[in-house]
Amino acid sequence: MKGKRVLVTAGPTQESIDPVRFITNHSTGKMGYAIAKMCMLRGAEVTLVSGPTSVAKPEFVHVVDVVTAKEMYEEVTKRAKDQDIIIKAAAVADYRPKSVSSEKMKKKDDDLAISMERTDDILKFLGEHKKEHQFLCGFSMETENMLENSRKKLEKKNLDMIVANNLKVEGAGFAGDTNVVTIITGQEEVLSLIHI
């Protein structure tokens, strides 16, 4: 990987509801940070665009901190054209509240409904604007039909590779130091890795 420019995304995003509350997911960023570190150790020039996480920043990696899906979209898309490899490991919010209250929302006796809107699709943009020399890898967290859903995502988003995992499999998912993944390429090659 010496001399290659690699962009990695990691962690969750946070979408504010009010100044106190936000919507997020269980991503810790560990996978993306580990990938960024390994690419750097293999000689790559690495940029890591990271959502909020407590994982220690890897040395000799340029880290760009973001909070929201919009910020991650902006930071990734403005850097994408200059990258040889893009690995999107971040668990970016698919939806955000349509409006954010400027004051803390007070508790009431009735139910609360929050109107949501789609966030910009980072992988869709990357796939549509992929340069001839670029390698694009995405991640797919599933709870059912993992292979089928991941293959569809690989094709729809114009990816070269997708790393799929099933949240219901023991040892897979968020927060752990191990994972159980299946790597799928455009040539229908499937490689299952246990506890990486």
Map each language-model feature to its residues.
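Glycine-rich phosphate/dinucleotide-binding loop and adjoining beta-alpha-beta core of small-molecule
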Residues: 40, 45-170
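Conserved small/polar residues in nucleotide/adenosyl-binding loops
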Residues: 194-196
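Glycine-rich phosphate/diphosphate-binding loop of Rossmann-like nucleotide-binding domains
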Residues: 4-68
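Short, glycine/acidic-enriched capping/hinge loops at junctions between secondary-structure elements
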Residues: 18-21, 149, 174-175
